[in-house]
Amino acid sequence: MKASLRLRLDQLCDRHEELTALLADAEVISDNKRFRKLSREHSDLTEITEVWGKYRQAEEDIETAEMMKSDPDFKDMAEEEIQANKVLLEELESQLNILMIPKDPNDSNAAYLEIRAGTGGDEAAIFSGDLFRMYSKYAESQGWRIEVLSENEGEHGGFKEVICRVDGDGVYGRLKFESGAHRVQRVPATESQGRVHTSACTVAILPEIDVDTNVEINPADLRIDTYRASGAGGQHINKTDSAVRITHIPTGTVVECQEERSQHKNKAKAMALLVSRLENAKRAAADAATSEMRRDLVGSGDRSERIRTYNYPQGRMTDHRINLTLYKLDAIMEGDLTELLDSLHREYQADQLAMLAQENGG
């Protein structure tokens, strides 16, 4: 292992010890915001610290075994000990390399899921509904909670647009590779000739940003409108102007929330979504400056970037970014996304490791 990496790991362990002490300090405990921030940093460093401790212990065990080799009675046992620990060192070093990949600070956050029908008319709206159901099923399997903020239903089912908040541990980190254009090839229910049609939907995944700590928005830059929510009616139909639309005038960004009966709650939720939209746009602009220097699996986040095809006649799903094809479309549409998401994360880790090796001179 390189000396520079050893030094960095020692520094991280020192920081972990420092954080442990800080989190026991009464002054820190009384400051909720600071306590949460330090707790998250402590949690991020815990696994690295534990694995680095195991690595150093394995090195010490090898040194001890090397000294035992001089005794004929213990030579064979010492050789076995040395070989076993060398294998362990390789495994632990691989773990450390992955753990040292820079983490997106938003990975542990909740996320906003936005699905919009693209080309394909009614069929695109129906497929938007299918994608929403797919993500909802996956969220349920993970113990996450989905809260719809606004929806615009299609005339024949599904959604022209649906925006929701997905709450749970590590939601953004798990779903962030889903942004892009999703294409479907199938025979629509409305197709009398049995011809396969191609439609598309766009998906955007945005990390939820803490409204209180990260962003300052001038109230003068906002136009806030209230209106009566549209929908299919029924027991939850809005009889008052409780739906809220907020426009950020400098950027033209528009958000809305219509699901709560309380105008105050709708405004708060719309404001939280606006903050996340603005921060995401700012981050995308900053990333664009360095995007030409590296291949990034997350891509530009451009909704026109086609990332996946769902082919119903062949029962397959293909992710074009990593050339992965899975012939279990029915299971995927029922929310079985584990194999797909794991594959995307492995590819991302491989990209990041290659980039780190390049930055460290090979």
From Swiss-Prot:
GO CC annotation terms, alphabetical: cytoplasm
A Pfam family reported for this protein in Swiss-Prot or TrEMBL: RF-1
Lipoprotein is among the record's keywords: no
Modification N5-methylglutamine occurs at: 235
InterPro entries assigned to the protein according to its UniProt record, in alphabetical order: PCRF, Pep_chain_release_fac_I, Pep_chain_release_fac_I_sf, Prokaryotic/Mito_RF, RF-1
PTM section of the record: Methylated by PrmC. Methylation increases the termination efficiency of RF1.
Subcellular locations according to the entry: Cytoplasm
Molecular functions per Gene Ontology: translation release factor activity, codon specific
Major localisation: cytoplasm
SMART domains attached to this UniProt entry: PCRF (SM00937)
Keywords: Cytoplasm, Methylation, Protein biosynthesis
Sequence similarity: Belongs to the prokaryotic/mitochondrial release factor family.
Protein purpose: Peptide chain release factor 1 directs the termination of translation in response to the peptide chain termination codons UAG and UAA.
Name of this chain's protein: Peptide chain release factor 1
Source organism: Acinetobacter baumannii (strain AYE)
